[in-house]
A protein has these predicted regions:
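Short Gly/Pro-enriched turn/cap motifs at secondary-structure boundaries
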Residues: 35, 198-207, 212-213, 271, ...
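N-terminal helix-loop segment corresponding to the beta1-alpha1 unit
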Residues: 1-167, 198-199, 357, 363-385
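Aromatic-enriched alpha-helical interface/lid elements that frame and gate functional surfaces
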Residues: 211-298, 302
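Terminal low-complexity tails and localization/encapsulation signals of metabolic enzymes
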Residues: 216, 258-259, 310-385
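Substrate-binding/catalytic subdomain of NAD(P)-dependent oxidoreductase enzymes
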Residues: 159-203
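A short glycine-threonine-serine/GTX helix/turn-capping micro-motif
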Residues: 135-146, 168-170, 202-203, 210-212, ...
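Short, well-structured beta-strand/strand-turn elements
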Residues: 5, 296-310, 372-377
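Mid-domain beta-loop-alpha active-site segment that forms a flexible
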Residues: 117, 141-156, 175-185, 210, ...
Length: 385
């Protein structure tokens, strides 16, 4: 987004470098693709905040910075005398954004957490999965990513305020609350209906009917919106290839006045399930792309449940030049990156540098702070950088 971002790591490197998946570098050593993905376009320095000299260098950097973003436990930076109050005296316009599991206040503020714990405390697993089975965790960790995106938005807003008022502020982001914001219309249910929203899994409520939205096909799954035009389209497709019952052929879901309190075992539900079973059987012998191409040609709300490999080969993403090959010196080869999440006509986003190695920009950044080469060498020898 145009900012110069400096990633500060301990002299031995961030623990994030130990997070998989891994691939071998040019020397045959495993390197984290997670690190490579989330730290492109950043400069990297190594600095020990546990030493007086390291903290003095950090304060010099703070004095020249617009914002800092960190995810230490609440109170940790204060214990080093480099918390928000101290930093604000050095740089009154500074925006200090903290991302922690439960925020910096409240009875859980000091608790250590993991993605699973924070997601669970935020309610995400409870609304995920099937109603007749236990809650499930979304496969890839989400809490930190959701909190990070909210921290980004809040930091940009705080920077705008700082620019206009010359006054910085502390932005306190709770992962638990960030996760809660992903629940959308589930949160008002207890207050309005006296009950929690139930897990729907591959189904969605259509009045009293649990309408299937995910169907197995020959090579995977497709998602379908069970509205009239889509159902009519698939019934028409079936009638072209197989013989179907007249009752199914004349089916029209819109003729029913379905309400949440309608009989779930009534005639309407029975007819709907018969149609659903017929569609389920028909789709089981079709491939994802057969189904998707038919849906596109007929304007039906159906899409394949893409695997990562499917996404990688998506003609839509290819047409938007989404994938970007970036040369990584550590790997000695190009690594394919996800491209920018949006396109800007006048100021296009791009990946212009790979993720940094440990301390790869030490000399550049420390020189800008008035630290000479001989001092940098001495700091490195003492393990401060």
């Amino acid at each position: 987004m145009g900012a110069e971002v400096i990633k500060i790591e301990p002299p031995g490197g961030s623990q994030t470098r130990l997070r998989g998946p891994f691939t071998k570098d040019s020397d045959g050593k495993p390197r984290s693709l997670y690190w490579a993905s989330y730290n492109s376009n950043k400069k990297g320095i190594s600095l020990s905040l546990d030493t007086d000299e390291g903290r003095q260098i950090f304060l010099k950097l703070v004095n020249k910075s617009d914002a800092i973003l960190e995810s230490f436990q609440p109170g940790y930076l204060d214990s080093l005398n480099i918390g928000f109050e101290t930093l604000a005296k050095i740089n009154p316009k500074l925006v200090h954004t903290s991302m922690t599991p439960f925020g910096s206040t409240g009875p859980y503020a000091g608790f250590i957490s993991t993605d699973l714990i924070t997601s669970s405390m935020g309610g995400m697993p409870f609304v995920s999965g099937d109603e007749d089975r236990p809650p499930v965790r979304i496969s890839f960790p989400q809490a930190e990513l959701v909190a990070g995106s909210q921290a980004f938005g809040a930091t940009v807003a705080a920077l705008r305020h700082s620019r206009n008022s010359k006054t910085g502020q502390h932005v306190d982001v709770s992962e638990q609350i960030a996760v809660m914001w992903t629940l959308m219309n589930a949160t008002p249910f207890p207050q309005l209906h006296g009950t929690d929203v139930t897990r729907a899994g591959a189904f969605r409520k259509r009045g009293p009917i649990d309408a299937r939205h995910v169907f197995r096909c020959a090579d995977g799954y497709v998602s379908m919106n069970a509205q009239a035009k889509t159902l009519d389209g698939f019934i028409g497709w079936m009638s072209e290839e197989i013989e179907i019952e007249k009752e199914i052929l004349g089916f029209n879901i819109d003729k029913w006045n379905l309400k949440p309190d309608s009989d779930p075992n009534g005639k309407e539900a029975s007819e709907f399930k018969k149609v659903e079973k017929a569609i389920e059987s028909f789709l089981s012998i079709k491939t994802k792309m057969e189904i998707f191409e038919r849906a596109l040609s007929a304007g039906l709300l159906v899409a394949p449940c893409n695997t990562v490999e499917d996404i990688r080969k998506s003609p839509q993403l290819e047409a938007r030049s989404f994938w970007i090959d970036v040369y990584h010196p550590e790997f000695g080869k190009d690594i394919t990156h996800l491209g920018p999440y949006m396109k800007m006509s006048e100021t296009p986003l791009k990946i212009y540098s790979p993720s940094p190695s440990v301390g790869s920009h030490n000399e550049e950044i420390f020189k800008s702070l008035g630290i000479g080469k001989s001092e940098i060498k001495a700091l490195r020898k003492r393990g401060i950088i």
